Amino acid sequence: FYDSVFIVIDAVKTYAKRYAKLARELAKTAKPERQAELLDIARICDKVPYEPAKTFAEAVQSVWFIQCILQIESNGHSLSYGRFDQYMYPYVKADLEAGRETEDTIVERLTNLWIKTLTINKVRSQARTCSAAGSPLYQNVTIGSQTRDKKGTVIPLSYLVLRSVAQT
């Protein structure tokens, strides 16, 4: 069992490093502003998901890699992002306080994540595709909720997720 776990960890690392390598290659011919973005993407892809994310950008990339890997491994359906606002909020809060992100840049990152999520698809029958509005994988995100004692758990990121979903 442990050998298989180490094989998977190594495969995840290889998968992410391929994206880092591609970003560095693209940076060589990019204009300065885009080059800086691509080099930051390479830095992030060299780090996550096998090292802890420290920023919202790193956390989003980590979540995306894991989502892709789950799709590759299980040919999955209904691989929800879970209680996204709850587990991502510490990164959002820290980045807003540090000035690394604004609400608008967070919404932009989230919108891009949802658009990428919608690119994962499977070939289905025409009837199935029509009934699922062309996206039959049901990859959902959960925001807000209640605690056992009926207290709301809606937080600022819950609203930013709603804003981003409205743009997709």
Model-derived features: positions:
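N-terminal leader/propeptide and maturation segments of large enzyme subunits in energy/redox metabolism
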Residues: 1-35
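Conserved catalytic cores of very large enzyme subunits
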Residues: 1-4, 33-168
